[in-house]
Structures are given as C-alpha cells and as structure tokens.
Amino acid sequence: IKMSDHEMINLDEMGSLKSSMETLQETLLNNHRIDPNLYIEYDVKRGLRDSAGKGVLTGLTEISDVNAYDLVNGRKIPAEGSLYYQGYNIYDLVNGLEGHKFGFEETIYLLLFGQLPSEKELEMFKEVMAQFETLSGRFVRDVVMKASNADIMNSMQRCILTLYTYDSRPEDISAENVLRQSIELIAKLPLIAVYSYHSYRHFRRDETLFIRNPQKGLSLAENILLMLRPDSTYTELEAKVLDIALMLHAEHGGGNNSTFTTHVVTSSGTDTYSSVAASIGSLKGPRHGGANLKVQDMFADIKTHVKNWTDEAEVEAYLCKILNKEAFDHSGLIYGMGHAVYTLSDPREVILKKFARKLAQEKGMMEEFALYELVERLGSRLVMEQRKMFKNVCANVDFYSGFVYTMLGIPKELFTPIFAIARIPGWSAHRLEEILNAGKIIRPAYKYVGHHKEFVVMPDRDPCMEYPCMDEENDKNGD
C-alpha cells in the first residue's frame, strides 16, 4: 500500500486541488443562508435565549444558583450579583477559609456530594484524590508527548479520550462508576495540562524539558505551580490566589455552554471520557473560555498606545476609540465588561479583584493594577453610554483573571486549560445529576424552512461549475 508522507495536505503546494477547494468553498458560501427575518417570524429562541437575552428554561439543578436581581412588588430590580454552590454563598465559602490555606478540594467535595465535608471527610477525600493524582511514565511518553502543539486544550481532549482505553469499565455509566471516573479525571487533569505545555515548549520551541511529579500533601493549586515552574518554588500568597481562582471558576449553573454540553452529551448515554472531552471542546471556544486572553491582549494594546496610564482623559479617549472600532481589534468591545446574567456586580470578579490587589502589591505591579481599576470604572460608564443601555454593565471574572495568571507566571497557553481544571468539578457534578435524574435525551426542535424540490437525473442537471482535473497534479506529486 502506497501511503502519503503527510497527515494533512498543504493546499498551497497543490494548485489544482486548491482550485477545486475554492470552487467547493464558494458553493458552500452561496448556500445555507437563512433569512434572519424567519427567526423572528417563527419566534426562534436563538442561543436558547428569549428576546431580552435571558436563557430559556431547559432543566433544573441543585448544584449552583446565579442571581442578579431582586423581586420588589413583582418587578425585577438589578442587584449585586450572588453565586451559590449547593446553597452556600461563594462569599461565605471564600471567607470561611480564613483559618485554612486552601479551599478548592473542599469546593470539589461540596459540588460532587452536595454537602460541606467534616474535617475527617475532607482528609479522606484528599487522600483519594492523591491516589488518583498520577500518570504513568508510559502514558506521558506515548500520549502526552506525542503530537504536541500550542493548543493545550486540544492536547487535553486527546489525552482524556485516550484514558478511556486504560479504564477497565469505561462504558459503565452507573453513578458509582462515573463518580470514580470523575474524581480520577479531576485529579489527573492538572498533570495533563502542565505536561502538555512542557511538551509543547520542548518539541515546538526547543526549550528544556522537565517533568515533575506532584507532591503528596500539597493542594492542587500548589502542585500546579510546583509542576509548572523550573525551580518548583512559589509563595504562600501565589498558591492561595490560584486556589481562590480555581474555586471561583469551578461552577456557574447548568446553562453555560460547556456545562450544557455536559448535560446534552450525558443524556445520550455516552461515556464519561467523551462527555469531558466534549465540554473541553466547548470551553475552548473564544466565546466561552477564551475571554481572559482577549482582555490581556486588549490591555497590552492600551499600554502601548496610552502614554500616561494615570491620565483619566487619555485612557477614556482610547477606550472610546476601542468602542468606535477605531482601535485594538476593531470589534467595538471592551473585553471583560458585561455579563449575560450579572448587572451591578459579578461576585467572582469582586472576590478575585481583592486577591489581585494583594498579589500586585507583592509583585510590585500596583501601577498595572491601577490601570485595570481605571478601565473598569470608565468602561462600565462608556459601554452604557455608547450602547444606550438601561441595564447596568459590570466587569466580569475574566477582567482580572488573565492579569492574575500573568502575575503568577502562568503562560497564555495555559489560561483556558486552567479554566478547564477549575470547571471539571462542576461538569462532573452536572453529569452525575443528569444520570441520577435520568430523563429523556435532550433534543430541541429545528424547523425546516427550505423548499422541497423535484429530483433531477444527472444528464439534466445544470453544469453550474467546472472542476479542474486533478489527475495531472496528483501524478506530479506522487499522491
């Protein structure tokens, strides 16, 4: 059998194939266009949202609750945002850590089991996690290190799907087995992410390769920093801030795209590895998990074009240029401002901002922090004025998270993977909830708005396109 030397074909090197693909692409773009007015005519809830942008009710959950309004005399009044995990306010969960160093493991327990653990229960759970927090040298060598690339989310999906083959009961979707799989994946995902990044650095950037095992007795946040850094050192505040960031990103209701993906895929009866890989694929999308990267890129642009970061008028003038599509990426967006649910404040942003300030003080980066605060204050007002909005606009958690990760020395390639590490406990809790309350497969309706046509036999079809002959080109390339 004659096989190609290339996994993917470079169209620029094959003229006739490139021409044929351009013809096919043009045909595609000339079809599949649906009249936007039809969505209004048939009252289609695009994005599963109503005309006001609120998500339509598609399910019930006890895992988390997101609130942004108070009901006063039957009217919804914007309020400070609140977030509850299994009924507990996120502010209380964070403030309750004053006597403890880290809280992400306790948050995982709470999300999975619906109750706060006792000291004995938490220690037992940490021991279980520690037993799972390992990858064999064979897996690291044969899976993680193969086909490394800059997209760590892609590598994580591949590794998760490959772990299926190492599981003696991969297709068992009983709640008991899925719990075991979930805890194991929660424990292994930080290793997969960090090792995939080191593999990328070594094989794609020709940098020194080092793989460090996690240390038993350390928190997930501590082990991430230990495995990531060449010298394996970190300060207590650095580990604490990362731990808080993981807690704040762990869960946010059943309707966000990646968690809803968990529900949709789980309802089909598929395995845990496929479900987690699908949710990672959702989170990878720039409309979902990549927002903090956009915020960082935007601030890099602001720092370049604004000479005096403390000059409110100069900063405001440049933000107006961004909103008018005259600067940065010409999208007209101030990234990190606004949220689909929150109005007056995003509680995650409020908490993370407090810890970002502490970290900026330790790192000597208060000048940058002050710029973030200024853009946050000005951006809220400018967006409301520009969009003529009556709903308040607040900064969301993505506004400060990228800045925090940068101060922690976490590379941009790991920003979204860190989000995945934080969110997999939430996905796991929702998968278990879907299984334990097994209903029907999720299948919303789509209305056909095309036209029925009479079949035309081949000789009578209109030859609307002429495809170039590729035989000659294939002969030249030996394919």
Residue ranges, per PLM feature:
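Non-transmembrane, aqueous-exposed alpha-helical and coiled segments at domain scale
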Residues: 4-479
